[in-house]
Amino acid sequence: MLTIIHGKIKTMTGVDYEDGFIRVDKGKITTIGNMSDCPAYENENNVINAQGNLVMPGIIEAHCHMGITEEKKGMEGDDCNENVEPITPYLRAVDAINPMDAAFDDALRAGITSAMVGPGSSNVVGGQFVFIKTHGRCIDNMIVKAPAAMKIAFGENPKVNFSGKDVSPATRMAIAAMLRQELFDAKAYKNKRKNNQCEMDFRYECWLPVLEGKIPLKAHVHRADDILTAIRIAKEYGLSMTLDHCSEGHLITDEIKESGFPAIVGPDMASRNKIEVQNMAFKTAGILSQAGIRVAITTDHPVSMIQFLPICAGLAVKSGLAADEGLRAITINPAIICGVDDRVGSLEVGKDGDIAIFDGNPMEVFTKALCTIIEGKIVYTDESICDKIDKD
């Protein structure tokens, strides 16, 4: 049992508590409310007095490569792109994530409790993302959802990767055609399997969760025309999809709104070091959100460092995103987009006890994470300011 008392609780459900408490038992939130309704806790061993500091859901990174692209390890620590063939749906991020990567500690120090992690964008089909918690030593024990999405990529990255090898795709036409062919073949396989007309095929089995609507396509798209191509193909096959990066999304807001697909915007803190990201700007998230599009914000770690995710949200707020939407973009919105909002993203009874305590607004640069909790377990405390949090 863990009890947090005297917290300024922001639940992300619309119901907040100026002086509230939370109880977590066996990893799940069991009670939340005003301090006036708090059960006796004096004889409990695990009590955190938040002393009026902000208590909110653990922050969520909606798209990154932590543990797959490690820091300062060169080729040995880079397992992000199997860039020798363009279609690799059978690759699983879970088989490449190293929980010992320094990014996991950085995430905990920033109040980030979970992340969507997967392959890079060198391939037309890159493989399967996994949604994980950010604390642990065995990746199998950190999994929330696997597979969680199927990575596809449009534009500059697959073009540059394969055009120099004298193999397709060398053009945007080929990228779209190859993806269509793969989906066509996977759909045909699904129908044959349903009628017991073929043997199992490992490659096409990987597509069944996508074709059955259990997980979305996760589309790497920057340029407006690439965003529209992704939408076109997903609609042709009746698939769900997230628009990741969406750097020129603000130029085609109506079309994205009509598609019904959510946007994962970023990494806007990165440099415009590619041709297709010349219109990348922090204003994109606000413009899309104001149009009624569900928005999450990403660092695309290690493109931007994962610990700067709350600051990226703050810069989006500075550029027009509503303040409450800034917090939603790193909590409940990514949870919904990633299909895990039944477990994380808000503070509600029955959900995982993933909680972050801050000494201010996490979107402000001087704010510190005082305590990070995953499934009721304290996984980080800021010792330099431990006097602000009593652990009795």
Regions found by a protein language model. Give the residues of each.
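Alpha-helical scaffold segments that flank or form the walls of functional sites
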Residues: 74-125, 169-196
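Active-site core of metal-dependent hydrolases
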Residues: 93, 190-281, 296, 336-338, ...
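Metal-coordinating catalytic core of metallo-dependent amide/deamination hydrolases
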Residues: 131-232, 236, 270, 302
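His/Asp/Glu-enriched, well-ordered alpha-helical/loop segment
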Residues: 71-72, 78-84, 88-89, 216, ...
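Histidine-rich, glycine-flanked metal-binding segment
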Residues: 9-56
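Active-site gating loops and adjacent loop-to-helix segments of metal-dependent hydrolytic enzymes
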Residues: 70-97, 138, 151-155, 160-161, ...
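C-terminal cap of metal-dependent C-N hydrolases
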Residues: 5-11, 17, 336, 348-392
